[in-house]
Curated annotation (Swiss-Prot):
Substrate binds at residues 53-55, 90, 203, 254-255. The lineage of its organism: Bacteria, Pseudomonadati, Pseudomonadota, Alphaproteobacteria, Hyphomicrobiales. This is Methylthioribose-1-phosphate isomerase. It catalyses: 5-(methylsulfanyl)-alpha-D-ribose 1-phosphate = 5-(methylsulfanyl)-D-ribulose 1-phosphate. Belongs to the eIF-2B alpha/beta/delta subunits family. MtnA subfamily.
Length: 366
């Protein structure tokens, strides 16, 4: 996608062909800064401190991180150590585990001197595959938007509600939940996005609004608790969110607050779709509420907030009284019964075990 008219992906190979570069997303939307990553510690820090975030992107970053670990020390011991270190950075998103395991399986039987080149190349394949998956999700989601548009007055926009950032900044390109929106906008369809601010890190207000604006997509930022009100008054035509982990039964783990949006959508008969690339589907578990590990992040993300001051500096301030505790679960689980459909790279499917198994037979067999 584009920033100030220049094409970017969220992660790319450095000029030396043996490092990577990323966009520091903690600085957006007020600063656009690029960081070079040349070792596994930097890759792990980028994931843990959310310089990169979004399930698909942290998976790609972790794959490159494992490759960089092999450049420094291609031993079996370091392969084990680096794999565990990267997996521990963000426990909820299944893409990270999937990508690390994929690279590890490829290289563990290779002679140590060949491991870096093989791992780095495989990370590149994962990155390119992610772009293709997201674009396919965009095309399948476009059909849903077209159907809704056909039932509205000519020229009236399809109003889409989204939560957090499941855009191109959360993937390598296109995004998951935003890919259908970009495809619709590029096809000339009138589309408008209501962007949940998404406390506590405000990734909707900071990131989704930024990328939609860069692409020229009409959008409006709303506070997290406004979505239900808009649904009650006919302001929302459909909801599209992303997923950090979807279970074999169709339960969806996504950014905290997603479950409440699904409940409101069900109460108002509004379709609730989840953009779910197959690497985000975890066929090893079925009960999302009981089995998905939920990351608990720092209290400081709730008690403090960053923004742009009047003098143009990014400033951090306290919101809560000194001494007040905060609880900060990063994700929640939306039961499959509340999901209208999963928009995958293989089409829109029902959120249930049989539909998922039929669509991804090779994953179930494996």
């Amino acid at each position: 996608m584009r920033v100030e008219g220049k094409p970017y992906t969220t992660i790319w190979t450095g000029e030396d062909g043996a490092s990577i570069k990323i966009i520091d997303q903690t600085r957006l939307p007020h600063r656009f800064e690029i960081i070079a990553i040349s070792d596994v510690e930097a890759a792990a820090r980028a994931i843990a401190e959310m310089w990169v975030r979004g399930a698909p992107l942290i998976g790609v970053t972790a794959a490159y991180g494992l490759a960089l670990a092999m450049r420094a020390d291609p031993s079996d011991a370091n392969l084990e150590r680096a794999s565990a270190h990267l997996k521990a950075t963000r426990p909820t998103a299944v893409n990270l585990q999937w990508a690390v395991d994929r690279v590890r399986r490829l290289i563990e039987s290779a002679p140590p001197p060949q491991r870096f080149a093989a791992a780095f190349a495989e990370a590149g394949v994962i990155a390119r595959d992610d772009i293709a998956l997201c674009e396919a999700i965009g095309m399948h989601g476009l059909s849903l938007i077209k159907t809704i548009a056909a039932g509205k007055p000519p020229g009236a926009p399809v109003n889409v509600l989204t939560h957090c950032n499941a855009g191109w900044l959360a993937t390598v390109d296109w995004g998951t939940a935003t890919a259908p929106v970009y495809k619709a906008h590029d096809a000339g369809l009138a589309v408008h996005v209501y962007v949940d601010e998404t406390r506590p890190r405000n990734q909707g207000a900071a990131l989704t609004a930024f990328e939609l604006g860069q692409h020229g997509v009409p959008h409006t930022v709303i506070v997290d608790n406004a979505g239900g009100h808009l649904m009650q008054h006919g302001g929302i035509d459909m909801v599209i969110v992303g997923t950090d982990r979807t279970t074999a039964s169709g339960d969806v783990c996504n950014k905290i607050g997603t479950y409440l949006k699904a409940l409101a959508a069900r109460d108002n008969n509004i379709p609730f779709y989840v953009a779910a690339p197959s690497p985000s589907i975890d066929f090893s578990i079925a009960d999302g509420v009981r089995e998905v590990p939920i990351e608990i992040r720092s209290e400081a993300e709730v008690t403090h907030i960053s923004g742009l001051s009047a003098d143009g500096e990014i400033t951090r301030v306290r919101l809560t009284p000194e001494g007040s505790r905060a609880l900060n679960p990063a994700f929640d689980v939306t039961p499959a019964r509340l999901v209208t459909g999963l928009i995958t790279e293989r089409g829109v499917i029902k959120a249930n075990a049989s539909a998922l198994a039929a669509a991804f037979r090779e994953r179930v067999a494996g």
